[in-house]
Design a protein with these regions (language model features):
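N-terminal basic/disordered segments at the start of proteins
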Residues: 1-30
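A generic structural signal for ordered alpha-helices
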Residues: 1-9, 49, 60, 64, ...
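A glycine-rich, hydrophobic loop/mini-helix early in the fold
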Residues: 30-96
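Internal, well-folded beta-alpha domain core
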Residues: 76, 80-195, 205-206
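Conserved, well-ordered active-site substructure
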Residues: 198-202
């Protein structure tokens, strides 16, 4: 990478240690309380994300990525630049295909039903080797849309996800019987994140 290319890269976290700790705690909270909105507060706001990524998506990637992590960006106009940005700041490896990746980074438009079959789902003996889908959506709110049940949810919880088609969720539903195999899902919008671990069951609300 030449000097001019380096100058074009967007910066990382403003305070790498403090901000990464904050983002990681919020991410753990999101995974342990499925569907509950978590705000990344200053950590996301202080990220100047590259073109093609929102603040929360960038903050999560800068927090979880390291040289052992394989990340796949959905093909698009910004994919190559995003890969260079993430490699520069974290040393993460860029996967050549979705099935090779530990984390798949998608826009709402990229969240098609076939993504579920392209992501690694782990094995019964090693479910932790499954992938995580990181999807940047158009809106997130605690409103009717998806009804969530399962571990970490008392009774049920509603989450409305903007920009993701019904077929994506129907395919996710059809794979729930594979548990403990299955991909986890992290949703972002602006500074907000919400998570749907593979243990969470979903139903479409009217």
């Amino acid at each position: 990478m030449n000097t001019s290319s380096l100058a074009d890269l967007a910066p990382g976290l403003a305070d790498p240690v403090h901000d990464a700790q904050q983002v990681f705690r919020r991410l753990l909270d999101a995974m342990s309380r499925p569907g509950r909105l978590q705000s990344l507060d200053d950590a996301a706001v202080r990220v100047d994300p590259p073109a093609g990524l929102g603040a929360a998506t960038a903050a999560v990637l800068l927090t979880i990525a390291d040289p052992d992590l394989r990340v796949w960006f959905a093909p698009g106009a910004h994919a190559e630049a995003l890969a260079a940005w993430l490699r520069f700041h974290t040393g993460a490896r860029i996967a050549g295909s979705a099935i090779e990746a530990d984390w798949l980074v998608l826009s709402a438009q990229d969240a098609r039903p076939d993504v579920w079959s392209e992501a690694a789902i782990g094995t019964d003996e090693a479910p932790h080797t499954a992938a995580t889908l990181l999807v940047e959506v158009l809106s997130l709110s605690a409103a009717p849309g998806l009804q969530l049940t399962g571990p970490g949810i008392e009774h049920h919880h509603s989450l409305d996800v903007g920009g993701v088609g019904t077929a994506f969720w129907q395919e996710r539903q059809s794979r729930e019987h594979h548990f403990p195999r299955g991909a986890d899902l992290v949703l972002t919008c602006g500074p907000l994140i919400a998570a749907l671990p593979r243990s969470t069951r979903i139903a479409l609300e009217d």
